[in-house]
Amino acid sequence: MKRVGAHVSIAGGVENAPLNATAIGAKAFALFTRNQRQWHSPPLQKASVDAFRRHCEAGGFDARHILPHDSYLINLGNPDPDKLERSRKAFIEEMERAETLGLVLLNFHPGSHLNAIGEEECLGLIADSINLAIKATDRVTAVIENTAGQGTNLGSRFEHLRAIIDRIEDRSRIGVCLDTCHLFASGYDLGTAEAAERTFEEFDRTVGMQYLKGMHLNDALRPLGSRLDRHACIGKGMIGIEGFRYIMQSPLFEEIPLILETPDSEGWKEEIELLYSLE
């Protein structure tokens, strides 16, 4: 089964995320487990955790189909030792929050070298950060998201993802989330079924489909290779509908969260219906 959903709000409490997902007909969802633009957040309360788990069960959401995202402030490749330590501590806390909620995945952006160190050194720092977090926690899989190639962010090339994975000590707890807008922005074509097939074949050769734990389904506002992270609604951007038809019809993407992050949250229910109509 294809598990299409969206990145839903936790306004009023994390326990509202599965309710918001159910309301739009989602079969998966993503969420922040805290304010993503602050370093410090209060611990999760037992009542919220219990309600979250109860609502997930009622909505039929298995932990494999829920893709929490870490804070945007975290940079696991930060060249500044003090800031790197702060990011590592926050990342471990994010992993712990996911575990508290009974979740098994944590989606994150790899990191940025900030023009202060080279790519290889930064990739090494990112991998070291992940290894530390895996050792400090019990079961959550760290899910690296590919990036659009903006600025000094790493992760836009499949080779970056492979280089990180190669340095991970426990590869049973590392995975990848592919964002379609980011793929397109970094030069991986999805505009036709044939182009999409070539892109995912390249991903399989370079990284391995066994590492794919989720996807973000977003059309792209800017042309192929723009290196700009600008999302568009499904079928209304430069990717177009055929790449998404390929994803919805391919057996490669069964039983992983396929998460909308498109600009119009009011239209997510209709976009989910549109995607299922492509099967």
From Swiss-Prot:
Its EC number is 3.1.21.2. Zn(2+) 2 binds at E145, D179, H216, E261. One of its GO terms (biological process) is base-excision repair. GO terms for molecular function: deoxyribonuclease IV (phage-T4-induced) activity; DNA binding; DNA-(apurinic or apyrimidinic site) endonuclease activity; phosphoric diester hydrolase activity; zinc ion binding. Zn(2+) 3 binds at H182, D229, H231. This is Probable endonuclease 4. Its cofactor is Zn(2+). Gene3D superfamilies: Divalent-metal-dependent TIM barrel enzymes. The gene is nfo. Endonuclease IV plays a role in DNA repair. It cleaves phosphodiester bonds at apurinic or apyrimidinic (AP) sites, generating a 3'-hydroxyl group and a 5'-terminal sugar phosphate. Coiled coil: none annotated. Binds 3 Zn(2+) ions. InterPro entries: AP_endonuc_2, AP_endonuc_F2_Zn_BS, Xyl_isomerase-like_sf, Xyl_isomerase-like_TIM-brl. It is an enzyme of class 3 (hydrolase). It comes from Chlorobium phaeovibrioides (strain DSM 265 / 1930) (Prosthecochloris vibrioformis (strain DSM 265)). It comes from the Bacteria. Keywords: DNA damage, DNA repair, Endonuclease, Hydrolase, Metal-binding, Nuclease, Zinc.
